[in-house]
Amino acid sequence: MARYGVRLENDPNLSPQDYQVLASRAEKNGFEAVWVPEGGGRDSLTSLATIAMKTEKVKLGTGILPIFARTPFNTAMGAAGMAAVSDGRFVLGLGVGHAPTVESRDGIPFKQPMTRMRETIQIIKALLAGEEVNFTGKLFKLTGASMGAATPKTKVPIYIAALGPQMLEMVGELADGVLMNWTAVDYLGEAIGHIKRGAEKAGRDPSAIDIAGYVRVAVGDDVTASRDSLRYQVARYASNPFYRNFFAE
C-alpha cells in the first residue's frame, strides 16, 4: 500500500517557525514522513530538530545527508541526537552527493563513492547498535569507537539515495530502504530488480526493504505558474551531469 510523505526544501527564506507550521500541517493531514535535504546554507539535522519539537507522530528523515562532508562517527552522533529529540521517529537518509558539489563546496576529492558508502553504513550500523567498533577498511580505521550512553534506544532506519545499479544493489544488501529521485516510471521496475538482487545476495528478504522516492508536484490555481515551477526544478537538476544522463535515457 502506498504511503505518503512530504519534502520540505531547506530554504533560508523560511524561518524555523515556518518549518514547524508546515510539518505540523503535514502531520495533521495524515502524511507519514517529513524529509529535509541539505542545502541553502543549512544542514538538515538542525531543521529536523526544530520540527521534532512541534510534532508527535510523523517520521523525520534526512533526504539526504551527504557522506563526504561528515565522518561516520560524526554522522552516527547526529543520528543518535535526532533519535533522542524525536523520540525514535528519525530516519537516516544517506547519499554520496555529486562530484561537482562535493569538490567545489566541501573541498573533498570525490573518490571511491561506493566504498565510502559501504564502510560508512557498516560503521554507523554498528555504532547505533551499541557496539564498540574496531574497524579497518580501505578508507576508515576506528579503534574502540562507541556511542556509549548516547546509543539510541530504538533502531534508526538507514536509507540510501540511489539511482544506479551498483548503489541500488547496495541498498538491498545493507539498507532499510531506498530514497530515489527523478526516477522514470519505465526505470522503476529495473531499479527495484537491482535492490532485490542485492538483498538475495546478502540473504535478506527483499520485501523488508522500503521503496521510497521523491515525486514532484506543483499545487496552485495558476497552471502556467505551476508548470514553470516544475520546469525550474527540471532545469536545476538537468544542470548536474549525473541527472542529465538519466534524463537523456
Language model features by range: what are they?
Residues 1-249:
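Active-site-adjacent structural elements that line small-molecule/cofactor binding pockets in enzymes
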